[in-house]
């Protein structure tokens, strides 16, 4: 059986193997035959089976089309469905990141102070940009932060994100909040206040940073009450002023009746941590949201002296209310299908113009691309379900894509000043898991995509990671026994990685 033999855009991608499987669909590693770049392709199955899930997909595609930043994961392409009104599956092509921050923390128990600082700096830069657009992420956690072995981080999974408008009723705005409890701000644990702010994301970043420092979740609550207990064990009981502003009577009563707790000095909790890091962490984890800094204020903290230059960190105008009018309406399945189709057309400019002019899709332009993918994914899934690592049958190419070696400096940050370059270089020199030999490093360097360091000209030591084998982020010669297969944890990591889509930076 041959693949990609008929006319269609799917022939641009050469599928390699399944790297993950989840409730939404299947993720496969692939090569873009036009550029030689490795990408991840996610097939989202039966998008419209549940309208709520379809709306989440629509929201994420739309939000991340509008948020274009070096520290946010990038979508490359979305394949055009064969029909406008009957399609069920979506194929999303996005940049292939090597791992996520959860795996990096688990695999690296001796991250340096330089790692700590650079990780937090990137997260706050992304958050500054996101919040400037009036977007709240609402589900920040280590598994929703992708990572490469050169310490590059990118925020992903905006399915729970919301855009804040001044005239939006807060009761409607927050009724579906279901983010991960461990990283949830205390005001969200008990519906403390009538209006929420970007401070909810700042709290999550604080929890993530604490986990980077210690290697363990800071507040692993079993339920909401236990979560509040853990928070107050560290921070102490909130002030009477804060308690008086809590609108939820049960939450206010519970905290008021709680035995008085005194805060634990962060220096006792986080041994050997940089005092400046702990001072900033205390600000990020203020119980009262009004006492937390904004992302921009946090970036101006003395902790980042030498690498931070606020004038260089991008912001953007608030997103248009028109883009998210659908959040205020009750949508049918057909409504969501049409809106998702419209978002897909953003990656097909010519078709978009025809759509805007009122013309129908010209189906013969792409008669079989998705059908080819369906057969190919079916082949891969069959082998995957048997626990086999499978490479699909495919045609032989007369000339394979050229190998590409990317610069050690992210192309999106080429205008960085010398101070930041020195900081990044210093961090890279401290990374863990060096290649076994210079010769092996030379052989592998050309295969690394997007932002991976060129070992030929700049040998550096990599972060360890328990990442998926298909990503080739880990030097293959150094694989441990856990990296030879795809564990359940890895399936979840890959699925969560693949569930996040953004528009390609122009």
Curated annotation (Swiss-Prot):
Disulfide bonds: none annotated. Activated by threonine and tyrosine phosphorylation. Its EC number is 2.7.11.24. ATP binds at residues 19-27, 42. The modification Phosphothreonine is found at residue 175. Residues 13-304 form the Protein kinase domain. Pfam families: Pkinase. Induction: By salicylic acid (SA), ethylene and infection with rice blast fungus (M.grisea). Residues 384-421 are annotated as: Disordered. A motif (TXY) lies at residues 175-177. The TXY motif contains the threonine and tyrosine residues whose phosphorylation activates the MAP kinases. Belongs to the protein kinase superfamily. CMGC Ser/Thr protein kinase family. MAP kinase subfamily. This is Mitogen-activated protein kinase 13. It comes from Oryza sativa subsp. japonica (Rice).
């Amino acid at each position: 059986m041959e693949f990609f033999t008929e006319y269609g855009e799917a022939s641009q991608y050469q599928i390699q193997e399944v790297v993950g499987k989840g409730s939404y669909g299947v993720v496969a590693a692939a090569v873009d035959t036009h550029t030689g770049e490795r990408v991840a392709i996610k097939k989202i199955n039966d998008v419209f089976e549940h309208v709520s899930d379809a709306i989440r997909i629509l929201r994420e595609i739309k939000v991340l089309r509008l948020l274009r930043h070096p520290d946010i994961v990038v979508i490359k392409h979305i394949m055009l469905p064969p029909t406008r009104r009957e399609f069920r599956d979506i194929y999303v092509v996005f940049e292939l990141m090597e791992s996520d921050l959860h795996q990096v923390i688990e695999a690296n128990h001796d991250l340096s102070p330089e790692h700590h600082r650079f990780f937090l700096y990137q997260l706050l830069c992304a958050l500054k940009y996101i919040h400037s657009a009036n977007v709240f992420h609402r589900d920040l956690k280590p598994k929703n932060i992708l990572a490469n072995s050169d310490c590059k981080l990118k925020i992903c999974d905006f399915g729970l994100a919301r855009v804040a408008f001044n005239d939006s009723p807060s009761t409607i705005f927050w009724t579906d909040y279901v983010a991960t409890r461990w990283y949830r701000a205390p005001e969200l644990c008990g519906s403390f206040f009538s209006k929420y702010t970007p401070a909810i994301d700042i709290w999550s970043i604080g929890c993530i940073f604490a986990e980077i420092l210690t290697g363990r979740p800071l507040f692993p609550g079993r339920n909401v009450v236990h979560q509040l207990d853990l928070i107050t064990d560290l921070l102490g009981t909130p002030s009477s002023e804060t308690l008086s502003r809590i609108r939820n009577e049960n939450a206010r009563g519970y905290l008021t009746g709680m035995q008085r707790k005194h805060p634990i000095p962060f220096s006792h909790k986080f041994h050997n941590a940089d005092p400046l890091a702990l001072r900033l962490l205390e600000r990020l984890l203020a119980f009262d949201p009004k006492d937390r800094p904004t992302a921009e204020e946090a970036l101006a903290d003395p902790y980042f002296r030498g690498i931070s230059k606020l004038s260089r960190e991008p912001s953007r105008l608030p997103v248009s209310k028109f883009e998210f009018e659908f959040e205020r309406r009750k949508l049918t399945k057909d409504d969501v299908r049409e809106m998702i189709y419209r978002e897909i057309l953003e990656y097909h400019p010519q078709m978009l113009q025809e759509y805007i002019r009122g013309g129908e899709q010209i189906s013969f332009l792409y008669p079989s691309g998705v059908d080819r993918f369906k057969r190919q994914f079916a082949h891969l899934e069959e082998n995957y379900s048997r626990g086999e690592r499978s490479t699909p049958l495919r045609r032989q190419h007369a000339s394979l894509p050229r190998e590409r070696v990317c610069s050690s400096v992210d192309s999106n940050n080429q205008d960085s000043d010398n101070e930041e370059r020195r900081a990044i270089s210093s961090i890279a020199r401290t990374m863990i898991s060096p290649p076994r030999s210079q010769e092996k490093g030379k052989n592998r360097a050309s295969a690394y995509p997007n932002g991976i360091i060129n070992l030929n000209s700049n040998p550096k030591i990599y972060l360890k990671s328990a990442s998926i084998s298909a990503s080739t982020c880990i030097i293959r010669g150094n694989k441990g026994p856990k990296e030879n297969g795809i564990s359940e944890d890895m399936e979840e990591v890959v699925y969560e990685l693949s569930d996040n889509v953004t528009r390609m930076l122009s």
